[in-house]
């Protein structure tokens, strides 16, 4: 006869994960040999990667992104979603956010020719499908990447503003703001910054609301090609 065992497991009421510490560790361990081409693969194949992970039950999976290999904990598989991830562990979501910050740091300090290389290689499908491009601002464009909400200070509240805008326009359910609303801002807990930083959030929302939002199925590469013929989409 089969035996089914059940135990009462105490709920994890607080998280010890600190994105700032985790990001420093990520840069120290994983960025040697990392190229813009590797990062490009993660983002343009993001949906495909996520879909693949949801179909695999393995808890630890190594992603090979154009030759750059990185191990992630597979929280995308439904049966793994409640499994605790080590504070120094990577998930697809964390990896996306870390690389978004890594790119912003690069853009803010490299030469203009290298900036052009970054912007030519890195495409943000979630921004592009809404008609948002690099021309709308580097912090804004990178804030459309999943995981950027871990760094509300670095990205000037734009990840939150994007979420608020989508909820206001009925494009997203309010429940998807929960993760962002738990984040720190420049060391401040959410209970503090939600009171003291309302003006900053409103300023970010004003910028986001003023973007040329428009749904499009035309890729960034296709738009660039058509622009050569005077066609702007």
From Swiss-Prot:
RNA binds at residues 14-15, 18, 47, 50, 75, 81, 94, 123, 125, 128, 166, 176, 182-184, 217. Keywords: Capsid protein, Helical capsid protein, Ribonucleoprotein, RNA-binding, Viral nucleoprotein, Virion. It comes from the Viruses. One of its GO terms (molecular function) is RNA binding. Signal peptide: none annotated. The keyword Ribonucleoprotein applies. It is found in: Virion. InterPro entries: Bunya_nucleocap, Bunya_nucleocap_C, Bunya_nucleocap_N. One of its GO terms (cellular component) is helical viral capsid. The N-terminus and C-terminus are involved in homooligomerization and play an essential role in viral RNA synthesis. Belongs to the orthobunyavirus nucleocapsid protein family. Homotetramer. Binds the viral genomic RNA. Encapsidates the genome protecting it from nucleases. The encapsidated genomic RNA is termed the nucleocapsid (NC) and serves as template for transcription and replication. The NC have a helical organization. This is Nucleoprotein. The gene is N.
């Amino acid at each position: 006869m089969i035996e089914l065992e059940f135990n009462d497991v105490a709920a994890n009421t607080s998280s010890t994960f600190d994105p700032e510490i985790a990001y420093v560790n990520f840069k120290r361990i994983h960025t040697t040999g990392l190229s813009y081409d590797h990062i490009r693969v993660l983002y343009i194949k993001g949906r495909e990667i996520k879909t693949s992970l949801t179909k695999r039950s393995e808890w630890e999976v190594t992603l090979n992104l154009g030759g750059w290999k990185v191990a992630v904990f597979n929280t995308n598989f439904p049966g793994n979603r409640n499994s605790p991830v080590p504070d120094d562990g990577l998930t697809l979501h964390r990896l996306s956010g870390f690389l978004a910050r890594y790119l912003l740091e690069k853009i803010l300090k490299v030469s203009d020719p290298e900036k052009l290389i970054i912007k030519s290689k890195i495409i943000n499908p979630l921004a592009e499908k809404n008609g948002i491009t690099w021309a709308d601002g580097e912090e804004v464009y990178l804030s459309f990447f999943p995981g950027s909400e871990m760094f509300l200070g670095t990205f000037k509240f734009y990840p939150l503003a994007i979420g608020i805008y989508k909820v206001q326009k009925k494009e997203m359910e309010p429940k998807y703001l929960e993760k962002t609303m738990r984040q720190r801002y420049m060391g401040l807990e959410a209970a503090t910054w939600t009171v003291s930083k309302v003006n900053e959030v409103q300023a970010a929302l004003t910028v986001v609301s003023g973007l040329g939002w428009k749904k499009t199925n035309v890729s960034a590469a296709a738009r660039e090609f058509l622009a050569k013929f005077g066609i702007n989409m």
